């Protein structure tokens, strides 16, 4: 659930570490994302009675460790999650259909078991049948809500357990918002229990240490500004509950070491992070990049986004080139596109030194509107006359690639309105910088 790969990415980035749960006995209160834990428990048991027993046992165990447990419970409909709900219903139906076929197969096979260890084999198959039957029952969301509400009645008179209903808001969102409020008065986050990876996005908003737990593991999370950036970038690229992500891109532990991380979640920094490969513009479609980035920022910062209209999915190419269009169009307004490249370069470069008369004559000799082929030596000569270098540049201003004049950002990549070339794959590019 939540943001794909975020937990593994934070583990890879060393801000999230796994601890021995047995070494930590006492917490300053415990906050639980109830539905995520309830579903996790339900997937491990065979019937409602067992689910009730196991869930209550978990809560009582948390009371012993935290003194007080707050169960955050989803309630009501969240309008901006309609698309997510529709997709989950579709996925749930496919899963239910698959499990029903599996149940039919097991029910048929158990009738034909005979011979050696017949009773043991039948007992094992019956356990599987019971579990499949229960999972099919829980594939109906109404059954989930009814069974959860029934279990929660066991805590109505328990002074050590508070039921906190989150009306038209995600429980994990409200939980982390309340945890921040508690921190402001006590100086310590409660233990957060959830299987939803959005929780780690919300917990990355400040650099204070946090303890986060799922059913089987305990984590210590000490996020830096870079981790907060990584969490937001992962929500943007891989998607979260309210934004489907950038189609055609994914952040994984395998490519994390190629991605530049920053402290500030700005458009320039985001595009730099995405520029781990070359991209070509495939369509003329543009998207409102600022709106997407603002939404991810506000969501991660626990601002109330539930009244927003969530951004639509776009491709990674549409995002990148829409993000770069403003810079390219600003440059293009003072750029002679229809003349040969040497002339384009002379017009685009701002002199960084005095140009003497002999150099002016040299530049004049390069003006040839009939010659559309570019000479590398001419390009280097023009750069030198204007006070620029082609090697060992601390700041790259332009790149020349196949008669294309490209802009550079953060010395990390080159681009125009139709292509982006990463600096790690720039053997065929002539740098112009200083």
From Swiss-Prot:
Broad enzyme group: hydrolase
Name used for this protein in its record = Putative nuclease OPG089
Task: Please state where this protein is localized.
Answer: Virion
* Biological process (GO), any one: DNA repair
Free-text comment on the cofactor: Binds 2 magnesium ions per subunit. They probably participate in the reaction catalyzed by the enzyme.
User: What role is this protein assigned?
Assistant: Putative nuclease that seems to be required for double-strand break repair, homologous recombination, and production of full-length viral genomic DNA.
Domain of life from the UniProt record: Viruses
The GO molecular function terms of this record are: metal ion binding; nuclease activity
GO CC field: virion component
Which cofactors go with this protein?
Answer: Mg(2+)
Task: Using the UniProt record, give the first listed, main subcellular location.
Answer: virion
- Which gene name belongs to this protein? OPG089
- State the EC number(s): 3.1.-.-
Alphabetical keyword list: DNA damage, DNA repair, Early protein, Hydrolase, Magnesium, Metal-binding, Nuclease, Virion
Task: Identify its protein family.
Answer: Belongs to the XPG/RAD2 endonuclease family. FEN1 subfamily.
